[in-house]
Amino acid sequence: MVKVGVNGFGRIGRLVTRAAFNSGKVDIVAINDPFIDLNYMVYMFQYDSTHGKFHGTVKAENGKLVINGKSISIFQERDPANIKWGDAGAEYVVESTGVFTTMEKAGAHLKGGAKRVIISAPSADAPMFVMGVNHEKYDNSLKIVSNASCTTNCLAPLAKVIHDNFGIVEGLMTTVHAITATQKTVDGPSGKLWRDGRGAAQNIIPASTGAAKAVGKVIPELNGKLTGMAFRVPTPNVSVVDLTCRLEKAAKYDDIKKVVKQASEGPLKGILGYTEDQVVSCDFNSDTHSSTFDAGAGIALNDHFVKLISWYDNEFGYSNRVVDLMVHMASKE
């Protein structure tokens, strides 16, 4: 089992750790966060307003974080180059600070003895992988990779199924997206993105997202055919993608439902879900899929023009894919 270090114990860092313990697929051996001391880590890991209390034991002991009896080394370095991952036995590092997202910055982890780095965010220059879509293109010459964004992980599997079966001529995506930590509780300064600084709990905020364009990086045939935007809405978690696209081959909406359902039960099982239930966002809280197609919510204008709806837990679904990507990478060692 691959030994993993986590840099940044925020929403994704903590939930990747939860996903690792829930699944037993990877071994968390070290955590680095300069802003959270050990006792605070215990508290933050144990109690979660969104996903509930951790079902297991967590305590501080001899300067280590102990989860379900397993000791985890704790570092508090600001500079990733100074983290002694090698000493802790960490082979892979999950870079989940949101700060070190380029090859150069994430590469600093290699200096401390890590063998590979998985960036839990989109990257300007690191190769991006989406499980179920292009993970087979990974080869072990790559030291630094990106797991793309939660929204790309929702959109890409759906876009792949639609494109493989009917061909996407072009498409526009909107994600109606839950609040994240970068937003403000009340109006405040936000650099050049003025709208992003408005109170998160009281506004629908139009925002940019690179998620749709990033699909073109993981599915090259769709490069230049998709773009999109986001609305940030006052919910704490779970988001939904609305993909409106023009199809090359004519398809009835029932044909689309059929191929998505088949994919969800076959090659994309566990990644792409399918539901015909009358669901709302809360129903996907703590769901581990990257994407769940909502058969009842989509509409067709005609046989070539459709609006497709897919839900995702933008925190927990994504965190589970980070774990799955590391398992896949380890299988290639």
Swiss-Prot record:
One of its GO terms (molecular function) is NAD binding. InterPro entries: GlycerAld/Erythrose_P_DH, GlycerAld_3-P_DH_AS, GlycerAld_3-P_DH_cat, GlycerAld_3-P_DH_NAD(P)-bd, Glyceraldehyde-3-P_DH_1, NAD(P)-bd_dom_sf. ISGylated. S-nitrosylation of Cys-150 leads to interaction with SIAH1, followed by translocation to the nucleus S-nitrosylation of Cys-245 is induced by interferon-gamma and LDL(ox) implicating the iNOS-S100A8/9 transnitrosylase complex and seems to prevent interaction with phosphorylated RPL13A and to interfere with GAIT complex activity. The active site is at 150 (nucleophile). Disulfide bonds: none annotated. Its EC number is 1.2.1.12, 2.6.99.-. Pathway: Carbohydrate degradation; glycolysis; pyruvate from D-glyceraldehyde 3-phosphate: step 1/5. GO terms for cellular component: cytoplasm; cytosol; GAIT complex; microtubule cytoskeleton; nucleus. The modification N6,N6-dimethyllysine is found at residues 3, 64, 192, 213, 225, 258, 261, 332. The modification Cysteine persulfide is found at residue 150. D-glyceraldehyde 3-phosphate binds at residues 149-151, 180, 209-210, 232. The keyword Transport does not apply. Belongs to the glyceraldehyde-3-phosphate dehydrogenase family. This is Glyceraldehyde-3-phosphate dehydrogenase. It comes from Spermophilus citellus (European ground squirrel).
